[in-house]
Amino acid sequence: MAKVKMKTNKTAAKRFKVTAKGKIKYWKGGVSHYNTKKSSKRKRQGRKADYVPENIADRVKQLIPYQV
């Protein structure tokens, strides 16, 4: 019987990137429109990428098994 491959969750694959050290990087949302009511600090912080917390990283790695 053939071995079954795991499927990559395509929405997660578009939103997360695994770095060389194994951390999972993501880009913050909510800064593409309706920005006039947001403060400059909030918009500036939204431009920076961030890393997934360790307690959630294992669940994200299950969604992107071939990128880990």
Swiss-Prot record:
Pfam families hit by this protein: Ribosomal_L35p (PF01632)
Keyword check for Secreted: no
Keywords from the UniProt entry: Ribonucleoprotein, Ribosomal protein
Disulfide bridge partners, by residue number: none
A single BP term in Gene Ontology: translation
Record Gene3D superfamilies: 4.10.410.60
InterPro entries to which the protein is assigned, alphabetical: Ribosomal_bL35 (IPR001706), Ribosomal_bL35-like (IPR021137), Ribosomal_bL35_sf (IPR037229)
GO terms assigned for molecular function: structural constituent of ribosome
Source domain of life: Bacteria
Any single GO CC term annotated in Swiss-Prot or TrEMBL for this entry: cytosolic large ribosomal subunit
Membership in a protein family: Belongs to the bacterial ribosomal protein bL35 family.
Official protein name in the record: Large ribosomal subunit protein bL35
